[in-house]
């Protein structure tokens, strides 16, 4: 029974989200108003984008714990540029933030690929380095909303067809990553590199290079979110998004992306982020304390990890079965 549910994990998670929203809406009708649902999706948009970046790293058996620090550093840099050089257009700052994020991701990827250092060690180190650079650049100070230009602050809040631009950014990234992973050769190689290193080797896929690519893409999306976060919340300081990387990893795990690599879908990643978004928005509405919110989120994460492990064991048994069948066929032919 459980194995059947795991086969349809995204559908199950989507149903749970709908039931949660309906249950809370029955107690607080304003919670399911169109305006609040749009705002809730908008609040979750940055988490969705970052989770998609993290997903690509996890697919290759890596992990990027420096995403939030990357976001904070790129956000501080573009905020300082906007303050000192207000004539620089927002589109240029957005490109700069994305490029800086990609560079930081490339540093992570090179250290993992060329030096063979475990990803968790590399990204823990660069996380601290990036936070330290923020302190050096800002002197420990803040960049507040009154020091930011109207255009800088206005882009994520602008509305297009009833949705804020920030939400459209999340939708666009979702579609692009989905297409990339499903239809591009490099996207499919990420799955192979993390799911079956032997198969990757014999098909000419360099698993280390694929990890490098995944870190570059993760860094690119983190840098992109650097501008989005700072402009949305209208403040830049050293501890921006501190600890948010754990929410990002949690969204991936809940969505069925395996920390063992090679398993996971974009839809699951989306639902994992939305699940956390609903919890973060709903529990305060019904009067549950922040401590219980953390406990509930932690419990859900543990359950998701256990389910993922069960799925990984089942996948491993299938691989062994297929290998045994292949050997039998070869023996018969010989």
Regions found by a protein language model. Name each.
Residues 1-18, 202-209, 283-334:
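Cytosolic-side transmembrane-helix boundaries in multi-pass membrane proteins
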Residues 2-5, 58-63, 84, 102-145, ...:
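Short loop segments and helix-boundary regions at transmembrane helix junctions
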Residues 7, 119-183, 210, 232-241, ...:
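Transmembrane helix-bundle core of multi-pass membrane transporters
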Residues 16-32, 135-138, 178-185:
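Structural signal for alpha-helical transmembrane segments and their membrane-water exit/capping regions
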Residues 20-86, 110-117, 252, 256-266, ...:
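Single transmembrane alpha-helix segments in multi-pass membrane proteins
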Residues 42, 119, 163-170, 211, ...:
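Loop-to-transmembrane alpha-helix initiation sites
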Residues 88-93, 97, 103-108, 112, ...:
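Helix-loop-helix "hairpin" substructures at the membrane interface of multi-pass membrane proteins
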Residues 222, 232-297:
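Transmembrane alpha-helical segments in multi-pass inner-membrane proteins
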């Amino acid at each position: 029974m459980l194995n059947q549910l795991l086969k349809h994990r995204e559908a199950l998670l989507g149903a749970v989200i709908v039931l949660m929203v309906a249950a809370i809406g029955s107690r607080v009708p304003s919670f399911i108003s169109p305006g609040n649902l749009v705002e809730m999706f908008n609040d979750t948009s940055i988490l969705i984008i970052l989770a998609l970046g993290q997903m690509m790293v996890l697919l290759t058996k890596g992990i990027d714990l420096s995403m939030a620090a990357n976001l904070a550093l790129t956000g501080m840099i573009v905020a300082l540029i906007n303050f000192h050089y207000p004539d620089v257009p927002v589109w240029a700052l957005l490109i700069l933030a994305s490029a800086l994020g990609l560079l930081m991701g490339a540093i992570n990827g090179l250290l993992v690929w060329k030096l063979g250092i475990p990803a968790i060690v590399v990204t823990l180190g660069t996380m601290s380095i990036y936070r330290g650079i923020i302190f050096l650049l800002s002197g420990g100070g803040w960049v507040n909303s009154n020091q930011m230009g109207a255009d800088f602050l206005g882009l994520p809040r602008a509305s297009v067809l009833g949705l804020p631009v920030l939400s459209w950014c999340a939708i666009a990234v979702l579609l692009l990553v989905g297409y990339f992973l499903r239809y591009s050769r490099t996207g499919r190689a990420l799955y192979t590199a993390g799911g079956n290193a032997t198969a990757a080797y014999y098909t000419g896929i360099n698993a280390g290079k694929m990890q490098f690519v995944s870190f570059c893409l993760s860094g690119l999306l983190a840098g992109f979110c650097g501008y989005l976060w700072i402009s949305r919340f209208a403040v830049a300081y050293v501890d921006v998004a501190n600890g948010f990387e754990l929410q990002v990893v949690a969204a991936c795990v809940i969505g069925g992306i395996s920390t063992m690599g090679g398993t996971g879908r974009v839809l699951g990643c989306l639902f994992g982020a939305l699940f956390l978004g609903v919890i973060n928005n709903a529990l305060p509405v019904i009067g549950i304390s922040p401590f219980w919110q953390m406990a509930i989120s932690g419990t859900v994460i543990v359950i998701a990890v256990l389910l993922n492990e069960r799925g990984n064991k089942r996948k491993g048994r299938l691989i062994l079965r297929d290998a045994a069948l292949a050997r039998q066929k070869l023996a018969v032919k010989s």
